[in-house]
């Protein structure tokens, strides 16, 4: 009985310690999710409204470039998910969805990374060109368009940083659910393997 009561008390103490440790992370997590929403929305708005007309070279829109279209879609999806995850975070049964949120946080971070890479490559080529394939830079003619695209990519990168931090926090929350094996359980398993009776203190 003493052994059982001791293990129960230890488990309760460990659970209480987890709650104390997780509390600051909950606040940080909520803050990051709230910050990610305006960053992603601003990135979408800056890119989706981006166009410029030049008398000599015509009109250029974000939709003309696949990398920019991809960035808009990914940021829109990320913003919607951020709002949904904020609503889930306010519910008491959030622990039921810890694994789902962990997976979606990881996926959002990877998608934001790929969209930032794709859009940044387009911006770089627009600013610097590519001499190997005889592509000239175009930002000297479409400076406002390039500037808005750069701002959108920067906002996307800021949202990415939020989700990188969220990925770490959600991973911490998920994996702290697993308790390390107690000393009594380890002794019992070792005794069973050796064929010896277990003596409880």
Swiss-Prot record:
The chain crosses the membrane at residues 27-47, 71-91, 99-119, 149-169. The keyword Cell membrane applies. GO terms for cellular component: plasma membrane. It is a multi-pass membrane protein. It is found in: Cell membrane. InterPro entries: CASP/CASPL, CASP_dom. Keywords: Cell membrane, Membrane, Transmembrane, Transmembrane helix. Residues 180-194 have a biased composition (Polar residues). Residues 1-26, 92-98, 170-201 are cytoplasmic. Pfam families: CASP_dom. Residues 180-201 are annotated as: Disordered. It comes from the Eukaryota. Residues 48-70, 120-148 are extracellular. PANTHER family: CASP-LIKE PROTEIN 2C1-RELATED, CASP-LIKE PROTEIN 4A4. This is CASP-like protein 2D1. It comes from Oryza sativa subsp. indica (Rice).
């Amino acid at each position: 009985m003493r052994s059982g009561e001791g293990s129960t008390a230890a488990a309760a103490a460990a659970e209480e310690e987890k709650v104390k440790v997780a509390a600051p992370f909950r606040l940080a997590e909520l803050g990051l999710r709230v910050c990610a929403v305006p960053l992603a929305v601003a990135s979408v708005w800056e890119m989706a409204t981006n166009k410029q007309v030049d008398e000599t070279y015509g009109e250029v829109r974000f939709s003309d470039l696949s990398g920019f279209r991809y960035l808009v879609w990914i940021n829109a999806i990320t913003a919607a998910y951020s709002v949904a995850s904020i609503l889930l975070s306010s519910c008491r049964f959030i622990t039921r969805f810890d694994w789902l949120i962990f997976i979606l946080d990881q996926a959002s971070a990877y998608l934001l990374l790929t969209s930032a890479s794709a859009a940044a490559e387009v911006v770089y080529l627009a600013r610097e060109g590519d001499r190997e394939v005889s592509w000239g830079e175009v930002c000297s003619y479409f400076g406002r368009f390039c500037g808005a695209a750069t701002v959108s990519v920067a906002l996307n990168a800021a949202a990415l940083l939020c989700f990188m931090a969220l990925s770490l926090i959600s991973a911490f929350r998920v994996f702290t659910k697993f308790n390390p094996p107690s000393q009594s359980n380890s002794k019992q398993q070792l005794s069973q393997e050796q064929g010896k009776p277990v003596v409880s203190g």
